[in-house]
């Protein structure tokens, strides 16, 4: 997951707002969130609501950074396409600007997904940083105010695989989390269906270290918007402490789930490493580790290959026990990320069109194989193909 002022022709005028963060009173636990809304609605039919195993078990489709196989990620166009293509949820990854505004970026590094390098006025901002163990040289979101970010334009991250998406380079600005909420609310009203949000708090330990902690800003935004008070929100993180903090603040609410992201490797979450802990992601994926996750989270989200690993030849192997192990302790399993190009598919689902070619049939077939594991939802760069796999 590991990732505008809006062109008039693509915006629904009159709903995009840049609301101020709510006051300290809205940072209280779930009781305040409840108090700011009217009587609790019946959420049983909403996407993402309901216990594991309850009701018809159709996996949820999460639009990964929107429909990022078809439009530049985290843009209005990407989210609009994901919604039009049937995503149950759309995903904004959240980073902080220098002035404390939460914006949708997959990582703090701006150079791969915006045209910042072409802005001479920002040349002096180029620097080198190591964030979550990765070192990059370029430009970073926390060195820019929101007003400065709004002068940049989004570009396609993977143009060699997604030339169709790259045609939209330069058309869209960086979105705030609040703009995404308002856009989602308007789309839900226009389409007559609930659309969930699955935001990820990115680099929490890093942002806290530079005086820009994400969590309370995030909570105040959830509380300030009627849509996020009432409708499905799944909150993701690769870290542990911030999810535990969220659980303490939010309590148990029917429309909210906490999602522990994991990788199936023997490395530590960043907050664990900083605190000198020894817990690794690999340990978190064991039955004992999953039991611990279930004490504070509702969902575990591993990479897809943790459910069905690859053989040495790149084809799919036998199904692992992860889904069954997670379900035994009451966790949903919602892996990431299905991508429709041959390069990203298991070898047994590729065609002969070349490594960079888009392969819709292969992608649908691969997703179907994973649906058979019993997973409860999945992230995909192309929600239309995810929806087709469920048909």
Question: What kind of region is each of these model predictions?
Answer:
Residues 81-94, 292-299:
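Catalytic domains of carbohydrate-active enzymes, especially glycoside hydrolases
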């Amino acid at each position: 997951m590991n990732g505008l002022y809006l062109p008039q022709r693509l915006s629904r005028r009159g709903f995009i707002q840049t609301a101020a963060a709510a006051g300290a009173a809205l940072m209280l636990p779930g009781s305040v969130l409840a108090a700011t809304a009217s009587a609790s609605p019946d959420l049983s039919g909403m996407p993402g609501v309901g216990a594991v195993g309850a009701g018809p078990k159709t996996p949820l489709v999460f639009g990964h950074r929107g429909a990022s196989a078809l439009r530049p990620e985290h843009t209005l166009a990407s989210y609009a396409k994901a919604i039009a293509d049937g995503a149950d949820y759309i995903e904004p990854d959240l980073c902080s600007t220098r002035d404390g505004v939460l914006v949708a970026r997959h990582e703090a590094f701006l150079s791969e997904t915006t045209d910042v390098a072409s802005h001479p006025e920002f040349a002096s901002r180029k620097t080198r940083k190591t964030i979550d163990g990765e070192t990059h040289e370029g430009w970073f979101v926390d060195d820019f105010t929101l007003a400065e970010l709004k002068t940049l334009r989004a570009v396609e991250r993977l143009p060699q695989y997604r030339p169709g998406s790259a045609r939209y380079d330069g058309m869209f600005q960086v979105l705030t989390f609040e703009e995404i909420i308002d856009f989602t609310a308007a789309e839900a009203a226009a389409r007559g269906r609930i659309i969930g949000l699955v935001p990820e708090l990115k680099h929490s330990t890093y942002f806290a270290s530079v005086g820009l902690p994400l969590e309370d800003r995030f909570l105040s935004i959830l509380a300030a918007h009627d849509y996020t008070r009432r409708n499905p929100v799944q909150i993701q993180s690769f870290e542990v402490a911030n999810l535990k903090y969220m659980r303490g603040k939010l309590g148990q609410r029917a429309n909210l789930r906490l999602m522990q992201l994991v990788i199936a490797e023997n490395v530590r979450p960043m907050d664990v490493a900083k605190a000198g802990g020894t817990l690794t992601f690999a340990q978190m994926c064991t039955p004992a580790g999953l039991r611990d996750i279930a004490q504070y989270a509702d969902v575990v989200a591993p990479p897809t290959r943790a459910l069905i690993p690859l053989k040495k030849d790149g084809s799919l192997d036998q199904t692992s026990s992860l889904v069954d192990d997670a379900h035994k302790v009451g966790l949903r399993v919602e892996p990431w990320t299905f991508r429709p190009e041959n390069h990203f598919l298991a070898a047994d689902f590729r065609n002969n069109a070349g490594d960079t070619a888009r392969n819709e049939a292969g992608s649908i077939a691969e997703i179907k194989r994973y649906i058979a594991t019993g997973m409860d939802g999945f992230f995909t760069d192309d929600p239309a193909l995810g929806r087709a796999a469920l048909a």
